[in-house]
Amino acid sequence: MVCYKQVSIYLGEDKTKCILFTKKKTHKQLNICNKSAKIKQHKTIDYLGCILDNNLSGEHMVLKVLNKVNSKLKFLYRQSEHLNPQLRRMLCNALLQPHFDYASTSWYPLIKQCYKQILQVAQNICIRFCLGL
């Protein structure tokens, strides 16, 4: 018996996603059905702003963070002639740093060393922008 029926929870099949967390690169497809609708299994899901992949490598989340930070940093560099150092630092703290910090305890320890270095380079670029170098 499925427990969500016992507590009268409606399960929207079109929004419901299934993911199997495993270290193996290849794994069996789960066959989960609700009445007649089959729930699709995904390799990555977006949950509360974090991208979780089936092997918890964190690579997709790193790429998302880098994309957001780089796009905002390009905009700030275009406006840099109008910004004093104090305002630059405030904008970096308000617009860029939250992307590095958001849920980092869940994805940062699991990423490969090469991604950690790429994130460090991105943070160094942010610091150079703050200092006007």
Walk through the language-model features, giving the residues of each.
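Short, glycine/acidic-rich hinge or "gate" loops at secondary-structure transitions
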Residues: 10-14, 110-117
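Basic, alpha-helical interaction scaffolds
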Residues: 36-107
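Short, conserved micro-motifs composed of acidic
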Residues: 2, 9-43
